[in-house]
């Protein structure tokens, strides 16, 4: 669904717009031209006709959870095929336009397949977050009521471009709760949401899930009169990104509409005097290298408790070199390379221990506690020597620190209470920062609960409660002044 045209000597990739599960005719639209990794991308700008189409869009979704999961599984099997054209195009786009290494791009496509194909996990997400996988389909008895979880309606997803899978996750959550999806892509990644929605259409263009997909782009920095109309029709908003993105979502969402905010976070690693230094270093290296530290869960600072920090430092160097081969770093801009070099020189000038990989593939700095320099990301990390957990807690910030990885795993039980009390939102084993386990929270919340509205059907007055074993005849109680007789 993505095509290209030639402008001068340059090939420009054209990104489609999808509304209601159908590619929009944008031949008369204005276009915005983006430059990604020195290549041109052309994206249609939404107009009033598009807004009216979105407003009038209403998909009757009578699917049960089994039908939803089975459809997602079918799509996931397409992504599992290495010959699926949508997958191949997606991988090429990530490499060409986003600067991913081929290995990184392939891994991203593999994860899309994994998420969609993991039927048990999809069921369990609903079960653990909503209390029952049946509550989205049936009225369930709870206490003295029957309760059902209904979709909010139109869910607007304001996606970030740094972590493609966050957008996939956002969309899957809305699908599991039977919401329509209005997806605003990021200028940094206009490919993932389109590829996912298009794969739904490839599978069955008439399916309610396919028809509930709308994918488009607008800029926060231009006239937002038309985008504001889309925001005004939202029943729930899911916002991903940095401070400016979250601020924009807050300012342009109607006051009576809930916003799920997945804003900027930082993450750290704790290495607690491991016996198996190699195993610990492998885990920490993975957590530094995955997404080149662009994700909220990416390790930026390492705190080493124990006496063998130099041995660990040397082993971590070896493992970072390994990741340079098995998961090569993505392309960097000139400014990013300059920032990387500047931090390296500053740390060397400060007499810190500094090691770096070939071609700026990674940077590791051993620095005193509290001597934090700038963080260029791009697989750069600071390691600090501490004596115990009390020296680490001042650097765990409430609402800022997301993931704390711990190695060895057994030490996490020792530290989890103090980490949680100081603001950590996730505690995971080193090497697992990118895998959000089923049943866990995301940024301190259970997102599916925010994507539904619970409707209660309460039992009649003839239904006695645990504390009052008679009919609840309120008029009679008032007439006979016997209310207190029934107080437990």
Swiss-Prot record:
One of its GO terms (molecular function) is acyl-CoA dehydrogenase activity. InterPro entries: Ald_DH/histidinol_DH, Ald_DH_C, Ald_DH_N, CoA_reduct_LuxC. Transmembrane segments: none annotated. It is an enzyme of class 1 (oxidoreductase). It catalyses: a long-chain fatty aldehyde + NADP(+) + CoA = a long-chain fatty acyl-CoA + NADPH + H(+). It holds the Pfam family LuxC. GO terms for biological process: bioluminescence. LuxC is the fatty acid reductase enzyme responsible for synthesis of the aldehyde substrate for the luminescent reaction catalyzed by luciferase. Belongs to the LuxC family. This is Long-chain acyl-protein thioester reductase. The lineage of its organism: Bacteria, Pseudomonadati, Pseudomonadota, Gammaproteobacteria, Vibrionales.
């Amino acid at each position: 669904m993505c095509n290209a045209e030639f402008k001068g000597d340059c090939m420009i990739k054209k990104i489609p717009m999808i509304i209601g599960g159908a590619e929009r005719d944008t031949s008369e639209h204005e276009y915005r031209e983006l430059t990604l990794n020195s290549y041109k991308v052309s994206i249609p700008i939404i107009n009033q006709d598009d807004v009216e189409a979105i407003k009038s869009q209403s998909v009757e979704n009578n699917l049960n959870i089994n039908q939803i999961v089975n459809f997602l599984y079918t799509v996931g099997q397409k992504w599992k095929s290495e010959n699926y054209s949508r997958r191949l195009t997606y991988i090429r786009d990530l490499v060409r336009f986003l600067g991913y290494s081929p290995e990184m791009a392939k891994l991203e496509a593999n994860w899309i397949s994994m998420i969609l194909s993991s039927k048990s996990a999809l069921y369990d997400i609903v079960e653990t977050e909503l209390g029952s996988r049946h509550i989205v389909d049936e009225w369930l008895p709870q206490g003295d009521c029957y309760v059902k979880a209904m979709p909010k309606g139109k869910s607007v997803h304001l996606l970030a471009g740094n972590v493609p899978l966050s957008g996939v996750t956002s969309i899957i959550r809305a699908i599991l709760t039977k919401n329509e999806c209005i997806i605003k892509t990021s200028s940094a990644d206009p490919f993932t949401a389109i590829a996912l929605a298009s794969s739904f259409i490839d599978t069955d263009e008439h399916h309610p899930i396919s028809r509930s997909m709308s994918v488009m782009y607008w800029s926060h920095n231009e006239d937002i009169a038309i985008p504001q109309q889309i925001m005004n029709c939202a029943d729930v908003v899911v916002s991903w990104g940095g401070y400016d993105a979250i601020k924009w979502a807050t300012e342009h969402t109607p006051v009576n509409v809930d916003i799920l905010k997945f804003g900027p976070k930082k993450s750290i690693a704790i290495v607690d005097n491991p016996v198996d230094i190699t195993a610990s270093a492998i885990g920490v290296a993975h957590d530094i290298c995955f997404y080149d530290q662009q994700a909220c869960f990416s390790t930026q600072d390492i705190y080493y408790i124990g006496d063998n920090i130099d041995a660990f430092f040397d082993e971590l160097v070896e493992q970072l070199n390994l990741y340079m081969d098995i998961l090569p770093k993505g392309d960097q801009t000139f400014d990013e390379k300059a920032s990387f070099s500047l931090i390296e020189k500053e740390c060397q000038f400060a007499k810190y221990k500094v090691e770096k990989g070939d071609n700026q593939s990674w940077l590791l700095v051993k620095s005193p506690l509290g001597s934090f320099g700038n963080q260029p990301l791009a697989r750069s990390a600071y390691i600090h020597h501490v004596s115990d957990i009390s020296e680490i807690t001042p650097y765990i910030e409430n609402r800022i620190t997301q993931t704390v990885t711990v190695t060895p795993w057994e030490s996490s039980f020792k530290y989890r209470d103090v980490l949680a009390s100081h603001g950590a939102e996730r505690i995971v084993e080193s090497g697992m920062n990118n895998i959000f386990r089923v049943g866990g929270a995301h940024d301190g919340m259970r997102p599916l609960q925010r994507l539904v509205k619970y409707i209660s059907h309460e039992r009649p007055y003839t239904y006695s409660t645990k504390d009052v074993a008679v009919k609840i005849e309120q008029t009679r109680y008032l007439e006979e002044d016997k209310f207190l007789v029934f107080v437990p």
